[in-house]
Amino acid sequence: MSSEIPPQVQNQLAQLQQVQQQAQALAMQKNQMESMKKESEMALEELEKLSDDAIVYRAVGDLQIQSNKDDTVAKLKERLETLSLRLQSITRQEERISKRFTQLQEQLKQAMGTQGQ
């Protein structure tokens, strides 16, 4: 019995590692998006407590720009919607990656089982 790993199994192992790295990258992106969404929700909550004629400032790059409450609320709601859509997309990608990972694991088990016989 040869201890050398067949090229097909090596290829499947490489694919499995790649899928695992993709899953880790997606998890990091998801955490970042969730954090950004939480911050935006908290900001919106605080904004809604202010009077309608309140002057607010919002960050634009390195600057703080004076704005009115309504414009800032609208921008935050738009940002929240965008973040929610991105999170949904990432969740779908995670599901696909998870299925692919399971599929590759099964293929590897079968390949290793037939190799050992």
Curated annotation (Swiss-Prot):
GO biological process terms held by the UniProt record: chaperone-mediated protein complex assembly; protein folding
Q: What is this protein called?
A: Prefoldin subunit beta
- Recorded name of the encoding gene: pfdB
Q: Which residues form a coiled coil?
A: none
At the highest ranks, the source species' classification is: Archaea, Methanobacteriati, Methanobacteriota, Stenosarchaea group, Methanomicrobia
Report whether DNA damage shows up as a keyword of the record.
Answer: no
What is the protein's quaternary organization? Heterohexamer of two alpha and four beta subunits.
Recorded source organism is Methanococcoides burtonii (strain DSM 6242 / NBRC 107633 / OCM 468 / ACE-M)
GO CC annotation, single: cytoplasm
Q: Where in the cell is it found?
A: Cytoplasm
Q: Which HAMAP family match?
A: PfdB
**Keyword terms of this UniProt record:** Chaperone, Cytoplasm
GO function terms (MF aspect): protein-folding chaperone binding; unfolded protein binding
